[in-house]
Amino acid sequence: MMPINQLISLLQPENVQVDSFNFKLHSKVTVAILLLSSLLACHGQFFSEPIQCTDIPGVSKQVVDSYCWTHQIYLVTSKTAGHDGRDYAYPGVTAERSDVNDKRFLSYYPWVSLVLFLQALCFVLPNYLWKTILGDNISSLMQHNLKSSGSESVQRNIELDRLAKEWSNSRGAYGHLAVAYLACEALNLVNVVGQMFLIDRFLGHTFWTFGSDIIENSMMPAEVRVDVLSEVFPKMSKCSYWKYGPSGQIDQLDTLCNLPINFLNEKVYIVLWFWLVCLASMTTLYLAYLLTVILVPSLQIKIISSKLPRPANKDNVSFAVHSKKLNGVERLGDWLVLNMLFSNLDKWTNGQIVERMNQVLA
C-alpha cells in the first residue's frame, strides 16, 4: 500500500505541472474531501460515544453498547413508512417482536472511516500511475532558467538551443505517453463510477438515489414529507441481545439504541453524493473534449498557439508539433508533451522555443 507520506505529498502543490485540472479534481480535491471525512468519522467513532443503548437488567450498559456496536443492529422495514408519533415512536422501531424477514440489518457504520480512507487511496491511484509512467520527461525538458522572461543571455540561448535539439531528436518517442495519459484519464471515470457502486453496496443499495430523493422530498409539503435520511442513517434502531436465563434457557432481550454517529455520517455522504455526481459529469465532459482534440488535429495547433505570444504563426507551430513522418499516436504524444511543457512556461519563452525548434528542424 502507498505510504502515508507519499499520499500527503500528492496533495501538495507541484513545481512542474504534468496533469490536467480534471486530474487535480480527482487526486487532490476528492482525496482531501475523503481524508477529511475519514478523520471526522474516526473521531466520532473512537473519541466520542457512537452508540448509546437502553439498559438491560443484569447486564452492564458498556457491555450492551459494545455488543450492539460490534453486532448488527436492525430496523423493522414495515415500520419505516408513516409519521413519527402516529405510526411508530421512531422510524424502523417497534415494541413487538419482528420476523427476521421484516428486519433490515445495518452493519456498515463501524467501517465508515476505513472505507473512506481506502477510497481516498483509489482516487490517488490514476494520478500516481500517470506520474510513474511519465517519469522526468517534462522536467528534463524544462530548465529553471527558462522560466524567466528577462533579457537575453548567453546561458539562456544555450539552453534554448539544447531544448530545441533535444526535441528534434526525441520526436515520435512520446506515443506511449499519449496512450498512458488517455488510459489514466479514462481510469479516473471508471474509478469514480466504481466508487459510487461501492458506496451503494456498502450502504445497502441506497446511495444511487440518495441525493435525488433528498431533493424530491424537500419539495413535498411538510405534512406528507418523509425523513429519507432516517432510512439510510437511522438515529434510533433496535438490537437483540441474547443471554442465559435463571433456568439456563436462552432469552432474547431487545434494546433501543441511539446512534449519534449517524448525524455525522449522513452529512458526509450527502456531500459525497453531490460531489461524486458532479465529478463524474465533469470527467465525462473532459473525456469528450480529449476525444475531440484527438480527432481534430487543427484543434491541437490552436491549443499550442494559445500559449504563444500573439499573433502566433500557426504554420511554425504545426511544423514544430506535427511531423508527417509520424503516425497519429506519435504526433499526439508530441503534442501532449509540448503542451505540458508550455503550460509550465510563460508565452514569451514558449514563442522563443517554437522559433528555435523551427530553426533546428528546417
Model-derived regions, located:
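Membrane-embedded alpha-helical segments and the immediately adjacent membrane-proximal loops
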Residues: M1-A362
